[in-house]
A protein has these predicted regions:
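Protein kinase glycine-rich loop
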Residues: 192-200, 204
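Short beta-strand micro-motifs within the conserved protein kinase catalytic domain, predominantly
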Residues: 251-267
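Conserved short submotifs of the Hanks-type protein kinase catalytic core
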Residues: 262-278, 282
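Activation segment signature within eukaryotic-like protein kinase domains
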Residues: 302-303
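Regulatory extensions appended to serine/threonine kinase catalytic cores
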Residues: 450-536
């Protein structure tokens, strides 16, 4: 039976699709459209019958009396798969006040993860029977008392430790032996096949559901029935997870109790069986041959696939708490969170908090679970997947730095993202999974572009496109950089957003009265809008008044302290002042907050280049040509829409004597670009730059000439300028004794003194006719007369 889910080519086995995991829709009458298989599997029939495949039970007290499944929303309801962040004190105001528009929170199409950009290796579906442990035992090194947490069940005097007994320190009973055996029937419905694993809350069993087509299910029992916290966690799990419906989260089917051989009732969570491989095992398989880690793009794709699921839990007021590679399972190309034992309400101030040392946020014991603590676990997990994180006392320690981890030296944006995600200050971390996904997607684009050289442009949720291009055909000027940099997107929810869209003006003097008049016509007051004062800051920068801009920024800082937009605009004001160190520091603040965005990298590159030029390359602090080159290269390699970056890259290559690299970069500008011709002209300049008569040769001259010949230059003045550049170089070479190897023309004139002089005379006279003032015209005519070939009558 083929899967009826749109876009899925899988087949249904054991009641579920082997590709997307969806149950088949209930049969419909001829000619009637089939409902979505997701809603059909969870909806309730109109007469109260359970709609679970192969189940004939009825819904009683909110659950099926046969299979135990809770009914889902009506068939017409839409299951939400992405969530907005919850409103809680963890939202950061220090580095990110708003999220803006997001383009990365949607689930990617199957076959490609990481916003559809990464094709990860498929993991075959594991035969459930093959996953059963032959000899289920808990290693002695992992046996600890559930109450005092001291070692129990250890070997002594050559005798193996006991799997069951009483703690010698506090007297609490412990049991690490499986409580269920093959063939046991739990809850009168689930037949045990064997043990799969031992987790933090006890043994996990494989079983078949005898009431629903013998489908495979997983039973998770408690570590110790006498452990009050563990029992409470199981009960809480059932309560919370009854409402959880997400394609990337394991489905909780039921909660049952079973009377053990000791007469004690033990609770079990019944979950869907996810047959695949955990990320922990995938990482282990990768490390066994050569000690390597997962490719960064693959690891990022895994994380991106799970962020919507975590965000969904947050929208319900729940925290996952124990995100780590062990708890993410890949089957084929689908990922799922498989262990929800640590899930807790963010408002729960009394329940025990479960997690794993090395992944868990350091402040969670004091703050409880928050979005910030969740972000921390994601950052730690990404680090463990991509690099060797040092261990201390058997747990992962501090993250390595670029000086010891080559991956971080290669991908600085990834390093910055990890630093923010795991910042010791919770308020400095990403404010939501959506915001983290936005930045991680940007980092992924950079990583992929660095790996194969193919650009991966993307829509920013924080910035608009570049407004102009700076540094084309001349030196970089601070005012040109400010005029070209992207502008932060306006928050559509701001009270002044509509007014900004309808108000014209350029200077603060023009805009302020218009804003005052507009705000008087609406109910909301000016003090409620942050976008209007930010627009006035930008207006001050656009008219070249950094002092007014800084004054306005200082006033705003009292209302929205730490907002990255203030640093963005303050940096531009300092740039107009030519305060390069201060400017660089402010742009660096934006980069730390938004490591996946190209805009702050472009700004940092421009400032580093300007500082290098201002200090003749002697300042190795801000004025670092190598740093500027790296930023320009990253931006251009990732997104060809930032054309300023390629001109900056070419300038710095030229300054370093790397002519071929400069030309190669400029040749990457596509013919469809408005700057295509300027890039080709700049390439000609790069070929000839710094060459005297002794370092020129015929091949260089002909390459430059052929490039000019192929250009379609609309401007007569611009065409004359670039021809003049080549012919002047040719004349200096000829007059230094250069001799061409053949009589082929150069730019339609002979490559000899008379031909080149004739061509130069024509260039000077063309430029004179296009000159805007008399003195320039006179100078060009004089140069034409001086270079014209001498003739004798």
């Amino acid at each position: 039976m083929t899967c009826a889910e749109p876009g899925c080519a899988g087949v249904v086995e054991d009641g579920y699709c082997v590709v997307c995991g969806t149950a088949p829709a209930a049969a419909t009458s001829a000619g009637a459209p089939a409902e979505s298989s997701v809603t059909a599997a969870t909806a309730t029939a109109g007469d109260g019958r359970c709609a679970e495949p192969d189940c004939g039970g009825t819904i009683s007290d909110g659950y099926c009396d046969t299979c135990g499944t809770a009914p889902g929303p009506p068939a017409t309801a839409t299951v939400t798969t992405a969530a907005a962040p919850i409103s809680k004190a963890t939202a950061s105001t220090r580095s990110s006040v708003r999220t803006g528009r997001s383009s990365s929170s949607k689930s990617s199409a199957r076959g490609h993860l990481g916003a559809g950009m990464v094709d990860v290796p498929r993991v075959p579906r594991v035969d459930p029977v093959s996953a059963i442990m032959a000899d289920p035992q808990v290693a002695e090194s992992k046996r600890f008392c559930g109450k005092c947490e001291r070692p129990v069940g250890r070997s002594r005097d050559g005798q193996p430790g006991r799997a069951e007994g009483f703690c010698p320190h506090c007297g609490t009973r412990f049991s690490f032996a499986p409580k269920l055996s093959r063939g046991d029937l739990v809850g009168g419905q689930y037949e045990v096949a064997g043990c799969l694993a031992h987790g933090g809350l006890g043994w996990i069993y494989l079983a078949t559901d005898r009431n629903v087509g013998n489908r495979w299910v997983v039973l998770k029992g408690l570590l110790n029935s006498g452990d009050v916290d563990a029992m409470a966690a199981a009960v809480a799990e059932r309560r919370f997870l009854a409402e959880v419906e997400h394609p990337s989260i394991v489905k909780i089917l039921n909660f049952v109790e079973h009377l053990g051989s000791d007469g004690v009732a033990v609770g079990y969570i019944v979950m869907e069986y996810v047959g695949g491989t955990s990320l922990k095992q995938i990482l282990r398989d990768r490390r066994e041959p050569d000690g390597g880690s997962l490719p960064p793009a693959q690891a990022i794709a895994y994380i991106l696939e799970m962020l919507p699921a975590l965000g969904y839990l947050h929208s319900l007021g729940l925290a996952y708490c124990d995100f780590k590679p062990d708890n993410v399972m890949q089957t084929d190309e689908q990922l799922k969170l498989i262990d929800l034992g640590a899930v807790i309400s963010m408002d729960d101030e009394s329940s025990a908090i479960y997690g794993t040392v090395g992944y868990q946020a350091p402040e969670i014991a004091h703050t409880g679970p928050t979005v910030a603590t969740e972000v921390y676990t994601v950052g730690r997990t990404l680090a463990v997947l991509t690099m060797r994180v040092p261990q201390r006392d058997g747990h992962f320690g501090e993250l390595p730095g670029p000086d010891t981890e080559p991956l971080l030296a290669t991908h600085d944006s990834l390093y910055r993202l990890l630093l923010r995600a795991t910042d010791p200050d919770p308020e400095a971390r990403f404010a939501s999974m959506e915001e983290l996904a936005d930045q991680l997607t940007g980092v992924l684009r950079e990583v992929l572009a660095a790996e194969d050289g193919r650009p991966r442009p993307g829509m920013s949720a924080f910035f608009g496109p570049p407004r102009a291009v700076f540094g084309v055909g001349g030196a970089v000027l601070p005012a040109d950089v400010v005029a070209a940099l992207p502008v932060p997107l306006i928050d559509p929810g701001d009270t002044g957003a509509a007014l900004l869209a309808t108000t014209a003006g350029t200077s603060p003097a023009e805009l302020e009265p218009a804003f005052e008049a507009g705000l008087r016509a609406v109910v909301t007051g000016r003090a409620e809008s942050m976008e209007i004062p930010l627009r006035l800051v930008r207006a001050a920068l656009e008219v070249g008044d950094p002092e007014d801009a800084i004054r306005r920024i200082d006033l705003l800082a009292e209302t929205i302290p730490g907002d990255w937009r203030l640093s963005w605009y303050r940096a531009q004001a300092l740039l107009l002042r030519r305060d390069f160190p201060g400017c660089y520091t402010e742009f660096e603040t934006v980069y730390r907050a938004l490591p996946g965005e190209p805009a702050p990298k472009l700004a940092l590159a421009a400032v580093a280049e300007l500082a290098t030029a201002a200090t003749d390359g002697q300042d190795r602090g801000v004025g670092d040509a190598g740093r500027a080159t790296g930023f320009y290269d990253t931006v251009w390699r990732t997104d060809r829409g930032f054309v300023s970056a390629v001109f900056g890259l070419a300038r710095l290559h030229g300054m370093g004597g790397r002519r071929e690299d400069a030309v190669t970069a400029l040749d990457q500008v596509e013919p469809a670009s408005a700057l295509y011709t300027e890039a080709r002209i700049a390439a000609v300049d790069a070929i000839l730059a710094g060459r005297g008569p002794t370092t020129l040769n015929e091949a260089v001259l002909r390459e430059a000439g052929n490039r000019v010949q192929r250009l379609a230059i609309d401007s007569k003045r611009r065409g004359a300028q670039v021809r003049m550049r080549v012919l002047e170089a040719a004349l200096s070479w000829l007059e230094a004794g250069g001799a061409p190897g053949d009589d082929a023309p150069l730019l339609e004139v002979g490559l000899d003194r008379e031909g080149v002089r004739t061509g130069l005379e024509r260039c000077y006279r063309d430029l004179a006719r296009e000159a805007g003032d008399m003195w320039t015209r006179i100078e060009l005519v004089d140069r034409a007369n001086a270079v014209r070939p001498r003739t004798t009558l």
